[in-house]
Amino acid sequence: MIQEASFIMLMGGDPFKQKEMCEKLGIIEDLKSFDGIMMGFSAGAMLMSKYIIITPCSLEYPEFRIENGLDFDNLSIYPHNNTSNIEYPDVLSVGEETYKKQDLIKVANQYGKFYLLQDNLREDGLTDVSIIKSINGVIEYYYEFDGKIWVVNHDIELLDKKINKVVI
């Protein structure tokens, strides 16, 4: 059934439950070999990643949890890192979740670089959007309004929108 589709959208929720459900349905290999367009939002983007990454950030996730994802194009996504700052703060609180810069860097040192994406709902009702498009290893970055993408490696650096594609 999956191979007959031309488009698959993986939605949000708990990325580990989403992966478990796909395993129980026996569709992991079908998703990995899918030849159409696949889009992931939130947990869906995390499932498409090389690694599903959660740092200790809340009562729901008090410890590091990192599992293999579908590994499309060897990149990993960690969504919902919403801040208006240009410099990534040492501690970022988003709702009931708290992200520590040192925890994010620790993961990158062990598992390789990954991307933090912003999808901030603004006071004016608009949403700051950031998107990564990857086709066969060719990566493009898209932003709307004040969307941001950070690269986590040995530090956390904001991608320079001047040298990356900026459209939506």
Predicted regions and their residues:
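Catalytic-core regions built around general acid/base machinery
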Residues: 1, 24-36
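Portal/gating segments that form or line small-molecule/metal binding sites
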Residues: 1-17
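C-terminal and late-domain segments of enzyme folds
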Residues: 7, 54-168
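Catalytic nucleophile loop
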Residues: 11, 34-51
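Glycine-rich nucleotide phosphate-binding loop and flanking beta-alpha elements
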Residues: 15-17, 45-47, 84, 132
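Glycine/threonine-rich flexible loop motifs
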Residues: 15-24, 88-89
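Short capping loops/turns at secondary-structure boundaries
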Residues: 20-24, 41, 70, 97
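Residues that form generic nucleotide/phosphate-binding pockets
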Residues: 21, 30, 106-110
